[in-house]
């Protein structure tokens, strides 16, 4: 059960399920299915499977079932990885983060159902689960020996690129929080047309302010990704890991902008809205991997300095 040969398929399964949890959470919010099971948790309307199953209940119940399954699969992956490849420096911290944030996510979700948290607290739910997904995603890349295939274990990342990468990660995470807040406050179509309602730029409602904040932070995050990409391409032309990684980050953020604009133009088409959530999930997972490389590079540098 916890054999090394199970690691690859198990890591793919865990990544897919965690991505599905992200999508499920977005679907619950987009369809207004948060109260699909009433104020009852972990049961649904006081039962394991309620007799009356309207669409809101089915969506909420499916999300809870997927979240429970993800906890089982991630725990299985974590135990297997810890046992078989725990000697790799990043594996144990990633295992701990994966499970810890998955549990925190479940508790925040339960609190939202039982005590009806306000929108600003509920928006944290997506960001917390995103950290858990990213940990599983990075663990999967390590399991598939991406480090060896692209010489990622030999990458030296200079101080400037580190600053660009951390700035990119922070801006993106704050932008993701405001995006979740847009969903929870039902502000998707607030503040007029995209990119700006030039005939009336002043926000008038809380929803307008939330939407404007999201667009502003999305712009800042996009600029930070472009600056990191520009520096990486100029100074790391011969390094495949850096070149591919930062190029992928730029392409994903462009797709994110496109789907964000299309969400408004299509009056929040459900498929486009879910695609918007999925793209940012993998974007943050990729940036998490770049941060792991950054920390590894820093660690190697310190070892070399201590050797002298």
Swiss-Prot record:
Location comes to: Cell membrane
Q: Listed GO cellular component terms?
A: plasma membrane
How does the protein's chain sit in the membrane according to the entry? Answer: Multi-pass membrane protein
Q: Which GO terms describe its molecular function?
A: metal ion binding; oxidoreductase activity, acting on NAD(P)H, heme protein as acceptor
| Annotated catalysed reactions | Fe(II)-heme o + 2 A + H2O = Fe(II)-heme a + 2 AH2
Q: Where does heme b bind?
A: 214, 276
Cofactor annotation: heme b
Query: Can you tell which superkingdom this protein's organism belongs to?
Result: Bacteria
For the Extracellular compartment, the record's topological domain ranges are 30-67, 115-123, 183-215, 266-270
Task: Locate the residues binding heme o.
Answer: 63, 125
Primary location: membrane
User: Which Pfam families has this protein been placed in?
Assistant: COX15-CtaA
According to the UniProt topology, which residue ranges lie Cytoplasmic? 1-8, 89-93, 145-161, 237-244, 292-308
Q: Where are the transmembrane segments?
A: 9-29, 68-88, 94-114, 124-144, 162-182, 216-236, 245-265, 271-291
Similarity remark: Belongs to the COX15/CtaA family. Type 1 subfamily.
Q: How does it assemble?
A: Interacts with CtaB.
UniProt protein name = Heme A synthase
């Amino acid at each position: 059960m916890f054999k090394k040969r199970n690691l690859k398929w198990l890591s793919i399964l865990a990544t897919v399920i965690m991505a599905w949890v992200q999508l499920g959470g977005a679907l619950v919010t987009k369809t207004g299915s948060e109260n699909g099971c009433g104020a009852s948790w972990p049961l649904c309307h006081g039962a394991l499977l309620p007799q009356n199953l309207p669409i809101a209940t089915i969506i909420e119940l499916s999300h809870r079932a997927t979240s429970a399954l993800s906890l089982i699969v991630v725990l299985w992956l974590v135990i297997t990885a810890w046992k078989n490849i725990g000697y790799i420096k990043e594996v144990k911290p990633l295992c701990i983060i994966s499970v810890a944030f998955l549990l925190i996510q479940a508790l925040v979700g339960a609190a939202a159902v039982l005590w009806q948290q306000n929108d600003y607290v509920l928006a944290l739910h997506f960001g917390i689960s995103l950290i858990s997904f990213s940990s599983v995603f990075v663990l999967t890349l390590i399991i598939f020996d991406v480090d060896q295939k692209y010489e990622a274990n030999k990458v030296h990342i200079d101080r400037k690129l580190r600053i660009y990468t951390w700035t990119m990660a922070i801006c993106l995470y704050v932008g993701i929080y405001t995006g979740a807040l847009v969903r929870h406050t039902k502000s998707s179509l607030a503040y007029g047309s995209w990119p700006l309602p030039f005939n009336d730029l002043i926000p008038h409602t809380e929803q307008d302010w939330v939407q404007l904040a999201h667009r502003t932070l999305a712009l800042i995050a996009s600029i930070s990704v472009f600056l990191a990409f520009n520096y990486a391409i100029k100074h790391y032309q011969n390094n495949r890991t850096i070149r591919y990684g930062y190029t992928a980050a730029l392409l994903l953020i462009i797709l994110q902008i496109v789907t964000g604009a299309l969400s408004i133009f299509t009056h929040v088409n459900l498929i486009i809205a879910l695609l918007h959530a999925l793209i940012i999930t993998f974007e943050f997972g990729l940036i998490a991997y770049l941060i792991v490389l950054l920390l590894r590079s820093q660690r190697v540098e310190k070892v070399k300095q201590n050797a002298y």
